Amino acid sequence: MNLFEDTNPRALKDLLTEIHNRVAVLPDFQRDFVWEPSATQELIVSIANNYPAGSILRVRDAKRVFAAREFEGAPPLDGTKHTFLVLDGQQRMTSLYQAFYGVGEHRYFLDLNKLIDGTDFEEAIFHVRASTKWAKAREDFDLQADELLLPLSVLKGGAGGFGQWSRKAARRLDNEKRIKLEDALDLIESKWIQAIDDYHSPVVTLSDKTE
């Protein structure tokens, strides 16, 4: 009997969507989320640089033997029938879900001015507590665009989400400045955003015959 259903890499954005839709959940015995935001930030830097960032182990849970719960920050399970239990990789996936979906105790931003100036990605990303006045003020698009601060949650829509945000930001400027900003943001998209959008994580899926 083959315990492995498959070992194929999965697109990160698809894995995060599964968490949001409660297709992938946690066994209730898993420990709570404990990662520091600095660790989340380092993980996002690795992904933007297409570095290995660990694998995911999950099991198809057709029998639903174990009590399950949603990932921290995801919508409540509320009777939703899940497909997978994530056995290893919880901390990484929770941190990425919260960062890209804009939930949890911290918010993550990219300073696009720094990226335009050629600064490395790790120097351009930062986090703040979601409860601060500063973070709440930057829920406003006009302020984001004025300061060229991109909430990482925009990227849950992948490169398309970034494209929509950047076009909307550039349209606020006159022709010459608009074209210059569009060109600069296109370079950021091709160098960094597309890498995040294309990122795949190794996933080992155990079959529902696993005991």
Where are each of the predicted segments found?
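Basic- and aromatic-enriched surface patches that contact anionic nucleotides/nucleic acids
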Residues: 2-37, 41-211
